Amino acid sequence: MGCKKKGGPLFYDRCFRKIKAMKDKVAVVIGAGDNLGSAIGRCFANEGFTVVAARRNGDKLTNLKNDIESKGGTFYGFSLDARIENDVVAFIKEIEQNIGSIEVAIYNIGGNIKFSITETSSQKYYKTWEMAAFGAFLVGKEVAKRMLPRSNGTIIFTGATASIRGSDGYSAFAGAKHAKRSLAQSMARELGPKGIHVAHVVIDGAIDTPWIQELFSDFYNEKKDQDGLMNPDDIAKNYLWLYKQPRNAWTHEIDLRPWIEKW
């Protein structure tokens, strides 16, 4: 039987298999970019998880797909705009029905923009909030619906320095990240007693990416020489650590930074 892509905003990078009994646990990474998001996906795949990754342009998931499948892992890729409620609902439903029960979900979306308050248009502010906070709400809500009957699961949100303090020129980003952090705190207090671990990860430092290397070469080289840039794979290990925590000693927020970062 030939494979056909399904209409609408979601697509599969390969045919879905109807699975009656799924041994592998499912890890969902929403915002699976080339750096941290992909590192998180690889990290969970290495632990035997079936990885479901989503980003707005799912065609860009090819490298992650190849990385995981070359090591014998199972991978599914989607195109998804997490700001659109109907698409998020369909995305979570498709996973639960056709891949397996979601064991851990990571929301890793948030656009970092810098504009003075007078140059921050309502459109820029709203879009930044949609990406970081509203999408997190939509995903958190739909995943929680599935996890609650099982009394089990982990939901992790990626934060930033802006989650805990606002800086000059970052009114939109800080506002959105503060909202995401508050969402995570509220969900943790509500869902924790029901068996669902909710955590927020503050990334307080520059991540080692080609983008930073290209645009800020002097900064990059100085920090790199001092081991002062955050390795995406090392960050990802903390997400796995959060998932593995016993429920008698859960962490609901961690902050990660290089050893030389001022804070």
Regions from the language model: what does each represent?
Residues 25, 74, 101-102, 116, ...:
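Active-site loop of short-chain dehydrogenase/reductase
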Residues 33-35:
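Conserved glycine-rich cofactor-binding loop
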Residues 49-63:
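Conserved glycine-rich Rossmann-like NAD(P)H-binding loop of the short-chain dehydrogenase/reductase
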Residues 70-85:
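Rossmann-fold cofactor-recognition segment
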Residues 116-129:
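Substrate-binding pocket helix/loop in short-chain dehydrogenase/reductase
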Residues 154-179, 185, 189-193, 207:
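Catalytic loop of short-chain dehydrogenase/reductase
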Residues 196-202, 220-263:
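C-terminal helical subdomain
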